[in-house]
Amino acid sequence: MDTNEGDVRFENEGSLEPLPVVRERTVVMRAVGLTKIYAAVSSGGGSGRGALELFRGLDLKVHAGEMVAIVGESGAGKSSLLHLLAALDTPTAGEVWCGETRLSSFTPKQAADYRNRDVGYVWQFHYLLPEFSAQENVAMPLLARGTRRAEAMERAAYWLGEVGLADRADHRSGELSGGEQQRVSLARALVTEPKILLADEPTGDLDGKTAETVFGLIQRLHEVHGLTSVLVTHSLEFAGRCGRVLRLREGRLVDATLESKP
C-alpha cells in the first residue's frame, strides 16, 4: 500500500533552470497511413489463420506543446500504437515521422539512439534496476550515451527533485513505494530532455490517490517544462484533463475531446 503519495515536495529552487516552454505549433510527430497486423501463430510455431489487424491507414499529428490522451477499449491497439511511435516495433505499412526523421529508415542502433535522444518512455511497470539507487536508475540513459558520470548524476539529481524525490536518491527501488517507483521512472524518461514524452498507462498499476499524484505530476512537468506528451490511459477522468483526446476505435483515431471533458 502506497503512503504519503499526496505529500510531494519539489526542491529545485536555485538549481538547474527548467527547459524553455515551447509555444510553436510545429508538428513534432506524425503517423501517415499506419497499419499494424499481427500474423497468427499456429501451435507448431508456424504461420496460422486469423491474423489480428489492429489498425489500417491510421493518421496522427502531434504538435509541439500538446498533451494528447489516447483512449479506447482493451485490445484496441493503444499500446501497440505507442510502441510504433517509439520505434519499439515496426508497422506493417505506413510511416512514423519524428520531425523530419522517418523511423522506418532506422537500423537497430539508430532506433536505440532515437529512444535515448528524442523520446522519453514511461511504462505501466517501472522497470527500475533493483541493484541500483534511484539516482543511478535515472542517470542510466545518460550513462548509456557516454555522458560523464558526474554530469549524469547531477542531471539525475535535478530530475529527482522535479518529481519530489530528492530525499530518496540513495534508495533502491525495493525501498520505494509503488508511486515513488513510477515517479523515478518518469524522471528517468525526462533526464535526456526528449522531444516527446510517451506514457503507456502510467497510472494503471496505482491506487486512486497515488494515481492522482502521479498524473498531476505529469501535468505539472508538462506545463513547467513545455513538454510534448502523448499518454495512453484507461481513465476518462485523466484523459479529460489533457488538451486533446483521441479514441482508438475500429482501427481509426477519432477526436473525442469534447465528450471527454467534464
Predicted regions and their residues:
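ABC-family P-loop ATPase nucleotide-binding domain
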Residues: M1-I37, D255-P262
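ABC family nucleotide-binding domain
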Residues: V27-R241, V245-L248
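H-loop (His-switch) and adjacent beta-strand-loop-beta switch element
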Residues: V245-L258
